Amino acid sequence: MKTSLQKSTRFINCTISGIPKANAILCKEGSIKIIGLSSEIVGDKTIDLRGGVVYPGFTDSHLHLLGIGISLETLSLTNITSPEKIIEKIVKKLKSINEGQWFKGWGWDQNNWRDTGYPTKEMLDAVSPKSPIYLKRIDGHATWVNSRALTIANITKKTQDPDGGKILRDNYGAPTGILIDSAMELVRQFIPKYSKADKKRMVLKAVSQLNSLGITFVHDAGTDLETIEILKNLISEKQLNICIYAMLTNNHKVYDNYLKSGPFFDNKGYLTVRTIKLFLDGALGSRGAALLHPYYDNPENMGLILLDIQKTIDKVKKFNSAGFQVSIHCIGDRANRIGLNILETAGERKLRNRIEHAQIIHPNDIKRFADIGVIPSMQAIHCTSDMHWINKRLGADRLNEVCNWQSLIKTGTIIAGGSDAPVESPDPLSGVYAAVTRKDKAGEPAGGWQGHERLTREQALLMYTQWPAYASFLENKTGKIKLGFQANFTVLSKNLMSVLPEDILKTKVLFTIVNGKVVYAE
């Protein structure tokens, strides 16, 4: 007997992950209505999935949506192997701007250079004495500026470091041109803001890129009011092709009204606003991550704590009582310990509070995540990017604290997986590969870096599907191919459970489907 639904879409010619006897899915109004055999299902519209393997739509649990869009329109300095080559690239691009206009770039990483020391303002002054230059580091926690930018911001020898930030200085106390964490704002406040139209264009570019990678859902780590308004407008215009779980930025102008009104839910599942993002420390690459012991390569430095602890405790209580989850950025082991202390003191377990990154965790704190009910949101690709230089930052004795995925899972917690894009590539297949191998794309090191912490393929898939759904309170709506669930699918050319590890990277995205609509086809 054949089953049909009006105004429905039938997806056929596929293998469905976890449902071996089915080869078709019928969807209507954005949800899954029937899973079965194509010979028994009739739809108003039929889409041939070309023999692909259908997975629950992949979710990235931590990225920066507008940041991705900005990166697509800004000079990229990623994977450049020396400051001299960066200067060459800047010189070519400077020809396209007017003298005195702000020049921006992003993505430099001194860890990729032979001399891994920080660059200086003089390098930029030599090619641009009159146009201010602002170059954001790959992690977004440091910036490299020239003297003109420092002059505009009135940063001199006498300028004190702001709370939660650092102005790097030479032996005479003069700023070198490197600003860490909150010190970046001293210059950034003078850069012209993007218009709403600019932001809309950038968001759409970001969504298009994410769709092409098989991503159907994202957790946006730091969303301001204007971006939320843009997203709502895109929903009403039926232009938003991705589902978004928005983390409010830590600014009272952004969150005050939400504290009064409570969380926001779009009834189509495109937008949820029910968490706030806090930054407790900086990043490891720029030595702002807060450590329990000094940096191995900078013994005077233990990193930065960016928040007042008591005020943060009060804020967690306030947000949890209003029904909002709290997501705290913690990279270093000191930050993770303090973050856990804060959430243990002030958090409500039912709010599923999160720690974003959880990259370096003291062994004594591993079990606390499960005990307190805090969800670690981690990015597998950070492990394989950082492993080549992290020994310089931490020394050999602390490497057992880094990216302890399997140790965390064994205590009973889940891990929400993501990329931190544009810091890393948003490609979830690169993330799955990193999670199951702990190797770089060249296949090094043999056995994987700290290979005992590798994930199984099943765990890696959960990290991009069911676990993010739970981390966003949506485990009964998305993250599975199940009747009544949101019709979000990622269709791949290969079966991730059976291909060789290196072939995960060769797997193609054939289709991306959001709310039953094909938003990307190869």
Task: Give the predicted meaning of each segment.
Residues S61, I372, A487:
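An anion/phosphate-binding loop that grips the pyrophosphate of nucleotide cofactors and donors
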Residues K93, P501-E522:
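P-loop/Walker A phosphate-binding loop and immediately adjacent motor/lid segment at beta-alpha junctions
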Residues L234-K238, G262-K268, E348, F369-G373:
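Acidic (Asp/Glu)-rich catalytic clusters
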Residues K317-S327, I331-N353, H357-A358, P363-K367, ...:
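His/Asp/Glu-enriched, well-ordered alpha-helical/loop segment
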